[in-house]
């Protein structure tokens, strides 16, 4: 460890003559509030970690300039485009059209036979199955949205479905899942079922069961898998299984750039006991390194100690590059 620190110091001294200095903002707009910073933190190798760079003005670095849109690819959009390419569907569409279809098209427009998107999707079997899924997802959308009452600090779920409505959509989703021939779409149905149960508030155990039955068995390293894992972690947290929940949040943080901020904000360690219990869920040193990184990004943590912990068990970790 001493040799490593000495090497880092030597490297830092060596690059001083060749590196233009970088100013850091100290929390205000006046020159005297700036400080000297030898290293440009924007040279970070993993752009998915950019929101966690040093900042004194916002909860996450660059929130005023929305760096996510500039630095992080849309993992959901890319997953859809990969699926369409694999199944020779919607190949004439560009990225902007994909975004409109996936994020802006209404349920009503997806039910119109004359809609250009409906016509295009109906050209292939994968497209027809996608259209059926998107219609189902749009039906559930109102129950997953947030509403602002008095402001952003008082945001709540817009509505939970009644028990009757929940049963209807659950049964519909299960039927669509069973008859869908595409694993990528089955995974998305599984995610919808987990999320629907989780947002019912009194269906946390059912949300966990839905994950175990309809998401986990598909064994897909996919953005939607980690979105479902995040919902499952929330359900576990709601029933008091904090160690398991924190571990799952660390898995989401480790594997999905687009979900990192949510996973970080949801990760809650209140005592050494909580930490030790969460660590027992880790299967290898890579997973432990992600846990140390999550704890290290906390405002009140000892960052140097967490870096040393990671170096000791997993020196190739992306969190120290």
Where are these regions (language model features)?
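Bacterial N-terminal signal peptides that target proteins for export
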Residues: 1-8
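Sequence-pattern detector for short linear motifs
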Residues: 8-9, 198
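Bacterial N-terminal signal peptides
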Residues: 10-17
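Extracytoplasmic/secretory-pathway proteins
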Residues: 20-195, 200-321
């Amino acid at each position: 460890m001493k040799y490593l620190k000495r090497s880092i110091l030597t490297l830092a001294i060596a690059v001083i003559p060749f590196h233009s200095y970088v100013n850091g903002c100290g929390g205000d707009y006046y020159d005297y509030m700036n400080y000297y910073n030898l290293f440009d933190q924007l040279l970070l190798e993993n752009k998915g970690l950019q929101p966690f760079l040093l900042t004194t003005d916002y909860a996450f670095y660059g929130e005023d300039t929305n760096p996510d849109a500039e630095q992080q690819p849309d993992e959901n959009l890319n997953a859809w485009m990969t699926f369409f390419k694999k199944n020779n569907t919607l190949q004439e569409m560009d990225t902007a059209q994909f975004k409109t279809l996936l994020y802006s098209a209404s349920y009503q427009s997806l039910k119109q036979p004359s809609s250009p998107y409906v016509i295009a999707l109906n050209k292939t079997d994968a497209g027809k199955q996608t259209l059926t899924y998107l219609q189902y997802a749009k039906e559930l959308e109102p129950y997953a949205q947030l509403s602002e009452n008095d402001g952003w600090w008082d945001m709540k779920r817009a509505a939970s479905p009644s028990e009757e409505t929940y049963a209807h959509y659950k049964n519909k989703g299960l039927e669509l899942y069973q008859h869908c021939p595409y694993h990528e779409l089955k995974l998305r149905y599984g995610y919808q079922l987990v999320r629907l149960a989780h947002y019912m508030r009194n269906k946390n155990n059912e949300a966990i069961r839905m994950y175990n039955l309809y998401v986990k068995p598909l064994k897909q390293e996919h953005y939607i898998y980690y979105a479902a894992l995040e919902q499952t972690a929330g359900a576990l947290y709601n029933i008091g299984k904090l160690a398991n929940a924190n571990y799952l949040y660390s898995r989401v943080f480790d594997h999905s750039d687009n979900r990192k901020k949510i996973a970080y904000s949801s990760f809650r360690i209140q005592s050494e006991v909580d930490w030790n219990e969460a660590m027992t869920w880790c299967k290898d040193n890579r997973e432990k390194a992600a846990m140390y990184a999550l704890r290290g990004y906390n405002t009140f943590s000892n960052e140097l100690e967490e870096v040393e912990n990671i170096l000791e068990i997993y020196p190739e970790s992306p969190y120290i590059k």
